[in-house]
Every structure is written in C-alpha cells, then in structure tokens.
A protein has these predicted regions:
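A general structural motif
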Residues: 1, 58-59, 89-91
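A short, highly charged nucleic-acid-interacting micro-segment common to nuclease
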Residues: 1-16
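Active-site metal-binding core of divalent-cation-utilizing nuclease and nuclease-like domains
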Residues: 5-6, 26-56
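Short acidic, S/G/P-rich loop/turn micro-motifs used as interaction or catalytic elements
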Residues: 9-11, 66-72
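A short, Lys/Arg-enriched amphipathic alpha-helix followed by its capping loop at the start of a domain
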Residues: 13-26
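Conserved catalytic cores of phosphodiester-cleaving nucleases, focusing on short active-site segments
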Residues: 51-53, 60-67, 82
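Well-ordered, non-membrane alpha-helical segments in soluble/globular domains
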Residues: 73-81
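Nucleic-acid nuclease catalytic cores
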Residues: 86-98
Length: 98
C-alpha cells in the first residue's frame, strides 16, 4: 500500500494521477511537527517537501515541484527540503521550469 503525504491536496492529487499504481493510495496532509509518523518527522525536520511517497511506511521518494524559474530566492528556499531527503538516502526529484 502506497501512502502519499503532501503539504497540499492539489499536489497530492497531481502526484497520485501520475501512475495507476497510486490509484488506491491513501493521501494525507503533512501535519504540524510532532504530529506525524516518525519517518515523516525525520524527513520534514528541515522543511516540508511537496510530496513524500511511502510504501508500507518506508520512504520511497520525495518530490519538490515549482513552476518558477530556478533563480533568486526560490531555489535556496527549497534546498533544505531536498538536502534532508538526500541525507536520509531517499531518492529525490526536483521539478522546475526552464
């Protein structure tokens, strides 16, 4: 069973629509710190990524997505989200416009 955690239900629905395997996935919003599964707490300890995909409560993927061109402050504010998942050896994808 896949679980999709997100800061935003629109993002979660977008991700869920990417693959038929996710059609029965449970979607949950990332809660405030201290109110999530322990693995979610580890992943969000620096900042909250757009998508966290779990299978049997084990992290499979972290996704960060932006429509803005990666210049200025936008890239920097997203780095903590990406760095933490990489530190935890979780595959990580960053989608952005070019």
């Amino acid at each position: 069973m896949y679980n999709i955690y997100s800061d935003n239900l629109i993002e979660a629905d977008w991700f869920k629509s990417l693959n038929k395997k996710f059609s029965d996935s449970k979607v949950a919003l990332i809660k405030s710190r201290g109110n999530n599964l322990p693995i979610i707490e580890k992943i969000i300890s620096y900042d909250r990524p757009d998508i966290i995909l779990l299978k049997n409560n084990k992290p499979l993927l972290v996704v960060e997505k932006t429509r803005e061109v990666p210049t200025g402050h936008n890239v920097g504010q997203r780095m903590a989200r990406l760095v933490r998942s990489v530190e935890l050896n979780i595959p990580t994808i960053f989608f952005f416009s070019i």
